[in-house]
């Protein structure tokens, strides 16, 4: 039996379609993702906390879901919107359908609306607060709820997704996450990396482990002394959800550790590192979400196609002199990468682990290892 569901935006726009997930009512910031595949990774990425995701590709769910392509233990997004949900999972790895997976995990989902019209409205007017409901179907009521709902600005969503206790990571990349012919390289040097988890995707830790690193995952609320107790060779700053500026505890910790350890940050970790250096961030009009974002490497001149998922960016107009722009997003020329002039610290505003997405930027993990090696074995004087 088809169940009616509605999406109401704070500007008064209402879309009516059918539910294919759980029953209920949720609020969130309505955004869009341009990826053609990788929906299971998107669903389980903690960075999507507080958001209602619209997929721009018209047919989603073709290959079902499985037990391997997950980036955390459960979905974290508020709601999910597609043009058409494929009820038939046509893949030998599938263990179930997308709709059943969403219903099992309590995710409200909507199909059958004009997603092109919705995405165009977001692109023109910017990301908006919205309500997705299978219960209240009154347009005026839903719009009023959307207007009064919380947005992302000023909210600390990190505390809602971080682990409760430290984890000694012991899992490497699965065969499906590797490039053809790629094997776990290991390393001639065993580095101990502490990863501050602000909502980390599991494949990031798997990449570090695959390179031979010992990885200790600490909750994002860990202090500098908590980190140093583990005597790490390097500090990794993970991705995570929402506005970076309210995450003041992490900004303070990073600022204390940057003079002492090599640092590599991605996505939210990139923004937090910049804030720790005295920079500021701002909210993008509709964000960067998708596996096809072009980025220019300022040093090499090469263009890298990257996977991105963020609604905030570092403000170049307030960038301190000790930070250097290393990468730029070619769609809007915003900062996509930074490095510190004095300390072995760098960061990027995208996902080099490519789960899902292109593999153009995997070299950044090797760069992190090289920085740890350089600190461990400093160049003798006179060379």
PLM regions with names:
Residues 85, 240, 343, 353:
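Flexible loop residues that form catalytic
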Residues 6, 45, 294-296, 326, ...:
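Residue-level detector of beta-strand face positions
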Residues 1-225, 229-230, 244, 355-357, ...:
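RNA-binding accessory domains that recognize and position tRNA/RNA substrates
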Residues 19-20, 57, 308, 339, ...:
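Short clusters of small/polar residues that mark proteolytic maturation junctions
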Residues 233-234, 238-308, 313, 357-375:
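Cysteine-nucleophile active-site neighborhood
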Residues 192-196, 306-307, 346-350:
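Active-site-proximal beta-strand elements of phosphoester/diester hydrolases
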Residues 301-343, 379-383:
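Catalytic beta-strand/loop cores that center a nucleophilic Ser/Cys/Thr
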Residues 108, 192, 262-264, 280, ...:
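Proline-centered loop/turn at the N-terminus of a beta-strand
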């Amino acid at each position: 039996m088809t169940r009616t569901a509605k999406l109401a935006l704070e500007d008064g726009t209402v879309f009516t379609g059918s539910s294919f997930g759980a029953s209920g009512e949720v609020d969130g910031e309505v955004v869009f993702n341009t990826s053609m595949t990788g929906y299971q990774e998107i669903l389980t990425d903690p960075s999507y906390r507080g958001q209602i995701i619209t997929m721009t590709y018209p047919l989603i769910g073709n290959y079902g879901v499985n037990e391997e392509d997950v980036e955390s233990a459960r979905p974290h997004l508020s709601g999910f919107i597609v043009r058409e949900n494929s009820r038939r999972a046509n893949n030998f790895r599938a263990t179930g359908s997308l709709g059943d997976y969403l219903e099992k995990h309590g995710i409200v989902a909507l199909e059958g609306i004009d997603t092109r019209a919705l995405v165009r409205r977001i692109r023109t007017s910017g990301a908006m607060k919205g309500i997705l409901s299978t219960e209240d179907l009154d347009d005026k009521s839903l719009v009023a709820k959307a207007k009064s709902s919380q947005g992302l600005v000023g909210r600390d969503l990190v505390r809602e997704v971080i682990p409760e206790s430290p984890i000694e990571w012991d899992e490497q990349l699965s065969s499906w996450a590797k490039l053809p012919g790629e094997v776990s390289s290991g390393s001639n040097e065993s580095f101990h990396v502490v990863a501050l988890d602000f909502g980390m995707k599991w494949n990031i830790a798997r990449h570090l482990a695959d390179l031979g690193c010992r990885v200790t995952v600490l909750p994002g609320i860990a202090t500098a002394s908590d980190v140093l107790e583990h005597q790490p060779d390097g500090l990794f700053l993970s991705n995570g959800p929402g506005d970076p500026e309210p995450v003041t505890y992490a900004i303070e910790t990073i600022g204390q550790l940057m003079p002492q350890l090599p640092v590599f940050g991605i996505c939210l970790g990139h923004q937090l590192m910049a804030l720790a250096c005295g920079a500021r961030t701002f909210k993008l009009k509709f964000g960067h979400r998708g596996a096809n974002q072009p980025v220019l490497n300022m040093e090499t001149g090469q263009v890298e196609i990257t996977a991105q998922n963020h609604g905030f960016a570092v403000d170049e107009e307030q960038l301190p002199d000790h930070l250097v722009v290393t990468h730029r997003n070619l769609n809007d020329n915003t900062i996509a990468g930074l490095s510190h002039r004095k300390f072995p610290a760098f960061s990027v505003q995208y996902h080099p682990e490519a789960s899902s997405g292109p593999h153009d930027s995997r070299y950044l993990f090797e760069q992190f290892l090289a920085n740890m090696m350089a600190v461990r074995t400093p160049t003798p004087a006179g060379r």
